[in-house]
Amino acid sequence: MFPRGAEAQDWHLDMQLTGKVVLSAAALLLVTVAYRLYKSRPAPAQRWGGNGQAEAKEEAEGSGQPAVQEASPGVLLRGPRRRRSSKRAEAPQGCSCENPRGPYVLVTGATSTDRKPQRKGSGEERGGQGSDSEQVPPCCPSQETRTAVGSNPDPPHFPRLGSEPKSSPAGLIAAADGSCAGGEPSPWQDSKPREHPGLGQLEPPHCHYVAPLQGSSDMNQSWVFTRVIGVSREEAGALEAASDVDLTLHQQEGAPNSSYTFSSIARVRMEEHFIQKAEGVEPRLKGKVYDYYVESTSQAIFQGRLAPRTAALTEVPSPRPPPGSLGTGAASGGQAGDTKGAAERAASPQTGPWPSTRGFSRKESLLQIAENPELQLQPDGFRLPAPPCPDPGALPGLGRSSREPHVQPVAGTNFFHIPLTPASAPQVRLDLGNCYEVLTLAKRQNLEALKEAAYKVMSENYLQVLRSPDIYGCLSGAERELILQRRLRGRQYLVVADVCPKEDSGGLCCYDDEQDVWRPLARMPPEAVSRGCAICSLFNYLFVVSGCQGPGHQPSSRVFCYNPLTGIWSEVCPLNQARPHCRLVALDGHLYAIGGECLNSVERYDPRLDRWDFAPPLPSDTFALAHTATVRAKEIFVTGGSLRFLLFRFSAQEQRWWAGPTGGSKDRTAEMVAVNGFLYRFDLNRSLGIAVYRCSASTRLWYECATYRTPYPDAFQCAVVDNLIYCVGRRSTLCFLADSVSPRFVPKELRSFPAPQGTLLPTVLTLPTPDLPQTRV
């Protein structure tokens, strides 16, 4: 039932009021939605010209708020979208310069600013928001006039990023850090000082530089240029950007080889804030933070004479964040309370693995030598693994410094800085770690002085070279014989070891027959002093086999070695069993330890393997005690002691023992030696003195050849120098001339050993002459 009269009129009035309210609300909602859709639409790519600037100007005037225009560098094209900006902010302009006739190629970015802030409508007037100064990055001379301040350079070579709604302003923090080594001084080095760019300006965080490969005019040049970008703050957010690039040049004068390295860090931090319209005490800003990080490393390596524009940089991204944080560098004048922070350079990034160029990286090899003396020939005593057959073409001559502290061979090759003149050869110090590489290089370069120095090191350390397959295995047969003969150069001397077990002391003395004087040679280590020890020389080394050591006279199997060319004592492989009072002889490059107390076994030492092995023992029905042994014609002869009437002969080729011609008498045999194919046996008689018997290899018969009349002769031991047999005792030293026709004792009595403390053990060593300097390794 419809209302009538006054009720109907009131009802119609109420319906009209309700409809108006509903229609007004719907219209307001539609307008709001349309406005939001209009404001949130993606901005089209803006052209670089007057149209784009006019559009930005109109939008800025309509909103009443200044905007910041940003252009991202090429490496950040995939990052977040940037805010639309007003005419106040500018984008970096591209600059490309390639001069075919010039010494360099430069590709970088340039910027210019045209800041004229305007505000209309409800926007609040603010002034003094930063400086209108700008920065003109380095450019080539052909485009220097086009990139001047206030000009409009050519369009850039990278697209502009999109924009976002003005209702959600953002703050952006971007930084880049890079370093580039190599090249020549740029034409802008002496230009006018750089100025700070305007607010909101952002430049590419990295530029590509291609430096010349052949630089001989300057040495060790370096420069650094930095670009710092300002900051523009708004009421609800901030846009902050910073960009810097470091360029350092290290170029050696006249160097045909160059290495270029470029590393950069780009970090983008974007803060998106939303404004709360409601009044109250709750926070007015809420937003999101986007953090992006990009690190790239590049390297270009060139060898020889190449064209100036053939460099190729390889980027290696790294997922690790930079070690330091980057902040803002400048603040807006009108909003000083909203801006804070300081510009801070990030630390140098950790670069990825370097690419290999032409087989191996020259950066990891040539640039390590100056700061790593292990790769040079100057230090003493270092050990460096030597490849058996190094690459002949991989040994350069010179090197530059580097920042890498690690030392490692590159492509299996070690590099050395060596003198190329004979006058500088005496200053070189080699060791066993580099002698073969230096020898190979010296033979290739025909450097006789350096080759002789390498042979000298090998000969003075022959035992170590013999045990090293990387050195001895690569030498030819002639070179092996050469280093051995070089070790035996010099003059043979009678060397006597005075061993005193009671005082645990001992020493070596050599006898100078020209001046009839004894000279001290070296001290024996306490470990090598023992009772009943034996000595022998092999390859001009003195070997000492221990006897009984300590107060309890415990048998010892230790063996020691002395190098007279370097003056160094060392310990070698011990015996398989202790042998006090054994006889030690050298035959065919091996040592033989024969018998000992209550022993008839024999051991053989191989110096190349540093190992003792058992050899065929003496015949089972013999008992070797206080015997003597010598070597003749690659055979070992043993007699004396309990073998008074027997003579045993050992053949190293057949590895067996034979019984020789029966000899000897009731007198005690003191010593037996071999000279010029004859065996000489010295027997002691208390009443008659010393009787000398000789046996030839052809007749194999013993006969008396000489006597020395003296009552109660002292015991002695013999050593042979040329054709002289020295009989060394505690109280006297006799000399016997082993002449093939008329063997005899020398009438002149020699000077006795000075103040003997213990047992005297003679041997023969070849000592260098005083005018030959020795190398201690």
UniProtKB/Swiss-Prot annotation:
Q: Which residues cross the membrane?
A: 21-38
GO CC terms of this entry: membrane
Instruction: Kindly give the InterPro entries that the UniProt entry links to this protein.
Output: Kelch-typ_b-propeller, Kelch/BTB_domain_protein, Kelch_1
Q: Check the record and name the Pfam families matching this protein.
A: Kelch_1 (PF01344)
Q: Which residues carry this modification: Phosphoserine?
A: 86, 365
Locate the region Disordered: 43-207, 313-359
**Gene3D superfamilies, A to Z:** Kelch-type beta propeller
Q: Using the record for this protein, list the coiled-coil segments as residue ranges, or answer none.
A: none
Compartments, as annotated in UniProt: Membrane
Grouped into one coarse class, the protein's main location is: membrane
Record's protein name: Kelch domain-containing protein 7A
Q: Which species does the entry assign this protein to? A: Homo sapiens
